[in-house]
C-alpha cells in the first residue's frame, strides 16, 4: 500500500512539472532529445506518438498524454536530471543557498517540485525555462516558445523585465518592405549567433567593481533571449582579454551567424579598458583600436558585412560630465567647411577595412560612468530595459537613442552614453522570437 502511494506521489510530481509543457506541445522536444541520445528504443518512442488509426480525437489525446507522462516518469533519471542540472548551472533558475543545497541533495522526484515552485514565483524564470528548452534544440521550428505571451498588453504599463517578441507577421512585413535597407537575418535553424561578455570585477591595484555581477546576469539573459550563445569571461589582464577576443573572432560559428555582440565591462581610461593588473605607473589597458582591428574585415572575414555591436561599460576619464548654465539661447554653432578635392582610385576589387561596426559607450570621453552596488551599472540597466521594450519594433540605432534619451535630464549622478565609430550601412533589427 505504501509502495502504491509512493508511485502516485511521483506521478503527481511529474504531472505537475510537465502539465504546461504537454499543453504547449513541447513533448516533441523530449521525443527529439530521446532520439538524439538513444535513451530508449524505437518501441519506447512509439508509445509517445498518437495512434493515427484511432477514431476518437479526444480519446487519442487523452491516451497520448497518459502515455507521455508515463514515459517521462520512466525516463526521468536519464533525461530530466540533466535538464534540471542544466537549468541550475546556467542560472536560468535563481535559487537561494538553502534551496540550492536542498535541490542538489534531494531525489529527482522532488527536484521537479522545487523547479515548479521556483517557476511559479518568477515569471521571467518561467519564460527563461521554456526558452532554454527550445535553445537546447534549435532545429525544432514547429514549436513556438511560450515567450510569445506578449501578444496582449503587459501586466502593467511600466513592466520592463520581459523581452517583448516581434510577431511573425511584422517580421515578414518589415523584411519585405525594407529588404534593401536592413541587414539580412538568417533563419533560426541555419544560424549560430555568438556573443562575448568580458567583465572585470576584481583588480590587483584598483577598487572592486561591486554590483557588476548584476550586469553580467542581466546582459547574459538579454543576449540569450535574443538568440545568442553567450561566452562570458571574468577578471582578465589586458593581454588575456586580447587573447580571448582573438579566439572569439576565429570561432567558425561566425560563418553561419548574422551578427555578434561584444560586451566589455571594467574600469577604464580614455583610450581603452583596464585589465586586472592596471595601475597608473604600470598601465594594463586593452586599447579600443585593438578591438576594432581584431574584428575588422582584414582579420575577421567570417563577420564581413555583418553587424558587430560593441557595448562598453567603463569610465573614460575622471570628469563628471556636468555643468550649471543659465536658461539662454544656445551659442552660435561652429561651422567648418572643407574644400572639395578631385579624387581618383583604380582597383580591381575593394572592401572597407572597417565597416558594419557600432560602439555604444556608457559615457562621453574624459568622463566617469556610475554603478549601483545593489543593482549594477546605471547604463547597463537602462540598456537592458530599452532592449526588452523596443527591440521587437525598433532597429539598433533607435534603441540606442532611446537609451540616450533616458539620460537626457542629468540626475544626481550624470552621464551621457555615446555612440561611436558607427559604420553600419543598414538598419539592424534583432527581431526577437524570429
UniProtKB/Swiss-Prot annotation:
Entry's induction text: Up-regulated by bacterial lipopolysaccharides (LPS).
Highest taxon listed in the record's lineage: Eukaryota
Enzyme class, spelled out: hydrolase
InterPro entries: CARD (IPR001315), Caspase-like_dom_sf (IPR029030), Caspase_cys_AS (IPR033139), Caspase_his_AS (IPR016129), DEATH-like_dom_sf (IPR011029), Pept_C14 (IPR002398), Pept_C14_caspase (IPR011600), Pept_C14_p10 (IPR002138)
Propeptide: 1-136, 328-346
Gene Ontology biological-process annotations: apoptotic process; cellular response to mechanical stimulus; positive regulation of inflammatory response; positive regulation of neuron apoptotic process; protein maturation; proteolysis; substantia nigra development
Pfam families per the UniProt record, alphabetical: CARD (PF00619), Peptidase_C14 (PF00656)
Protein name per the record: Caspase-5
EC number: 3.4.22.58
Ranges in coiled-coil conformation: none
Molecular function per GO: cysteine-type endopeptidase activity; cysteine-type peptidase activity
Quaternary structure note: Heterotetramer that consists of two anti-parallel arranged heterodimers, each one formed by a 20 kDa (p20) and a 10 kDa (p10) subunits. Interacts with MEFV. Interacts with SERPINB1; this interaction regulates CASP5 activity.
Function: Thiol protease that acts as a mediator of programmed cell death. Initiates pyroptosis, a programmed lytic cell death pathway through cleavage of Gasdermin-D (GSDMD): cleavage releases the N-terminal gasdermin moiety (Gasdermin-D, N-terminal) that binds to membranes and forms pores, triggering pyroptosis. Also mediates cleavage and maturation of IL18. Cleavage of GSDMD and IL18 is not strictly dependent on the consensus cleavage site but depends on an exosite interface on CASP4.
GO cellular component term, pick one: cytosol
Active site (UniProt): 267, 315
PROSITE patterns named among the record's database cross-references: CARD, CASPASE_CYS, CASPASE_HIS, CASPASE_P10, CASPASE_P20
Tissues/organs with expression: Expressed in barely detectable amounts in most tissues except brain, highest levels being found in lung, liver and skeletal muscle.
Keywords associated with the record: Apoptosis, Hydrolase, Protease, Thiol protease, Zymogen
Organism: Homo sapiens (Human)
Family: Belongs to the peptidase C14A family.
Annotated CARD domain residues: 56-148
Keyword Flavoprotein in record: no
Catalytic activity: Strict requirement for Asp at the P1 position. It has a preferred cleavage sequence of Tyr-Val-Ala-Asp-|- but also cleaves at Asp-Glu-Val-Asp-|-
PTM info: The two subunits are derived from the precursor sequence by an autocatalytic mechanism.
Amino acid at each position: 500500500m505504501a509502495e502504491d502511494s509512493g508511485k502516485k506521489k511521483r506521478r503527481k510530481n511529474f504531472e505537475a512539472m510537465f502539465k504546461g509543457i504537454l499543453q504547449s506541445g513541447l513533448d516533441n522536444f523530449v521525443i527529439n532529445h530521446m532520439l538524439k541520445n538513444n535513451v530508449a528504443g524505437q518501441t519506447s518512442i512509439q508509445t509517445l506518438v498518437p495512434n493515427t488509426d484511432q477514431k476518437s480525437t479526444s480519446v487519442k489525446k487523452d491516451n497520448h498524454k497518459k502515455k507521455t507522462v508515463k514515459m517521462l516518469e520512466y525516463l526521468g533519471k536519464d533525461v530530466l536530471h540533466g535538464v534540471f542540472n542544466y537549468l541550475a548551472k546556467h542560472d536560468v533558475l535563481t535559487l537561494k543557498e538553502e534551496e540550492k543545497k536542498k535541490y542538489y541533495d534531494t531525489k529527482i522526484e522532488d527536484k521537479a517540485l522545487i523547479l515548479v515552485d521556483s517557476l511559479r514565483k518568477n515569471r521571467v524564470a518561467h519564460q527563461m525555462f521554456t526558452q532554454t528548452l527550445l535553445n537546447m534544440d534549435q532545429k525544432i521550428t514547429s514549436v513556438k516558445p511560450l515567450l510569445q505571451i506578449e501578444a496582449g498588453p503587459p501586466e502593467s504599463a511600466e513592466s520592463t523585465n520581459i523581452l517583448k517578441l516581434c510577431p511573425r507577421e511584422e517580421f515578414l512585413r518589415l523584411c519585405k518592405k525594407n529588404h534593401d535597407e536592413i541587414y539580412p537575418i538568417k533563419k533560426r535553424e541555419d544560424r549560430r549567433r555568438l556573443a562575448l561578455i568580458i567583465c572585470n570585477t576584481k583588480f590587483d591595484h584598483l577598487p572592486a567593481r561591486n554590483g557588476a555581477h548584476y550586469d553580467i546576469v542581466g546582459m547574459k539573459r538579454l543576449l540569450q533571449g535574443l538568440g545568442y550563445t553567450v561566452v562570458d569571461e571574468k577578471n582578465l589582464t589586458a593581454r588575456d582579454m586580447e587573447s580571448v577576443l582573438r579566439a572569439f573572432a576565429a570561432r567558425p560559428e561566425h560563418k553561419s551567424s548574422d551578427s555578434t555582440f561584444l560586451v566589455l565591462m571594467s574600469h577604464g581610461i580614455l583610450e581603452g579598458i583596464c585589465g586586472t593588473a592596471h595601475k597608473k605607473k604600470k598601465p594594463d589597458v586593452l586599447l579600443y583600436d585593438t578591438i576594432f582591428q581584431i574584428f575588422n574585415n582584414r582579420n575577421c572575414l567570417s563577420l564581413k558585412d555583418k553587424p558587430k555591436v560593441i557595448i562598453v561599460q567603463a569610465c573614460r576619464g575622471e570628469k563628471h560630465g556636468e555643468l550649471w548654465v543659465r536658461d539662454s539661447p544656445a551659442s552660435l554653432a561652429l561651422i567648418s567647411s572643407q574644400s572639395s578635392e578631385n579624387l581618383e582610385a583604380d582597383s580591381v576589387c575593394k572592401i572597407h577595412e572597417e565597416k558594419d561596426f557600432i560602439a555604444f559607450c556608457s559615457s562621453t570621453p574624459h568622463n566617469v560612468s556610475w554603478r549601483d552596488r545593489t543593482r549594477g551599472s546605471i547604463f547597463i540597466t537602462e540598456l537592458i530595459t530599452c532592449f526588452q521594450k523596443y527591440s521587437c519594433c525598433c532597429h539598433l540605432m533607435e534603441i540606442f537613442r532611446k537609451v540616450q534619451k533616458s539620460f537626457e535630464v542629468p540626475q544626481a549622478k550624470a552621464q551621457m552614453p555615446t555612440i561611436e565609430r558607427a559604420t553600419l550601412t543598414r538598419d539592424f533589427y534583432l527581431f526577437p522570437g524570429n
